[in-house]
Amino acid sequence: MIIETAEFLQSNTQMSKLPETRFPEFAFIGRSNVGKSSLINAITGKKGLAKTSGKPGKTITVNHFLINGNWYLVDLPGYGFAKRSKTEREKWDKLLHNYMLKRENLVYTFILIDSRLEPQKIDLVFIEWMAEAQIPFVLVFTKTDKLGINTRAKNLEIYKKQLLQNWEELPIIISTSAISGQGKNEILDLIGNQTSSFVAFNSTKI
């Protein structure tokens, strides 16, 4: 898939105000400082499309971008901020759960994992919740350019073994780098195929 157009559509904190569901939707989420904004900008080829901030997680919003006029890229706030108040955390948890469980045009959620770190409890808990809720997701390992080939492979293997303690098979896994562009085509090809399937399926309803 080639990205021809990418435009910011809207930010929301309420499910009722999200865009209409006629286009397939692909969400990106991860713990704070995982490199989400940089990866989104690299994938779309639009520098500055997703804003990077020195205070990530400050605003709790669901951010929609319209890509190529026929699918939504959704930038979800980073999770795991201890500095948020209890009220803010509860508000975000409710919005996130409602979005994941009720957004009918959500095709895939890309869960971003920092490839430099050992498996983090906060990531594993979220991944397990997604699996139990039967919400389709892809694991995206970020910042692979900051690791040597051997270390990268070792860290990925550790993560796979951790997941296979509870699962019989692994989800789709993509290694990425916002710097080198690694993984960009894999993500876009997956989105392209799923967008075509979404359109074909919905055309049968008309």
Per-region residue spans from a language model:
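Hydrophobic aliphatic residues
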Residues: 43-47, 100, 191
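Conserved nucleotide-sensing/catalytic segment adjacent to the nucleotide-binding pocket
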Residues: 68-106
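Amphipathic alpha-helical transducer elements in NTP-driven molecular machines
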Residues: 59, 89-93, 121-124, 181-184
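Canonical P-loop GTPase G-domain recognition
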Residues: 3-15, 146-205
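Conserved G1/Walker A P-loop phosphate-binding module
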Residues: 1-83, 200-206
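Conserved C-terminal guanine-recognition region of P-loop GTPase G domains, centered on the G4
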Residues: 94-170
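Conserved nucleotide-binding/hydrolysis micro-motifs of P-loop NTPases
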Residues: 58, 71, 78-81, 116-118, ...
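Short, well-ordered secondary-structure micro-motifs
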Residues: 19, 63, 84-85, 120-123, ...
